[in-house]
Amino acid sequence: LNKLEHSEDEYFEGIKDLKVSCHLLINRTGELLQFVPFDKRAWHAGESAYKGEVNCNDYSIGIELEGNEIDPYTDEQYISLIKVTRELINFYPKVNSQNIVGHSDIAPDRKTDPGKSFDWNRYLSNL
């Protein structure tokens, strides 16, 4: 499993004291970095709720995409995201296109990602 080296990037240094994690990070080149095993809790959602269930960290898989909410995500990121999601759908019966949402859906008062530049149709139609 991977770990962000805070000294490698000024941004990482600024967030080193935050108590957050994700299962996967997909960087701009499409590389997958796993930080937490899928069967363990990652701390990506915070205070959240989905379909009446609270604490989404307890039962969800958190995949982060490197980027911001303005610039489009890369083709490589979509390719990797679609590929890994297909694998998760095959392995976990409860994972399906109807249960895939963004942080903005489960914590709308606090989170805005993946943002307006994320192409949900491109992603979900290719699963």
What are the residue ranges of the model-derived segments?
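Active-site-adjacent loop/helix surface patches within enzyme catalytic domains
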Residues: 1-94
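Basic/polar, cationic surfaces and motifs that engage anionic cell-wall
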Residues: 68-127
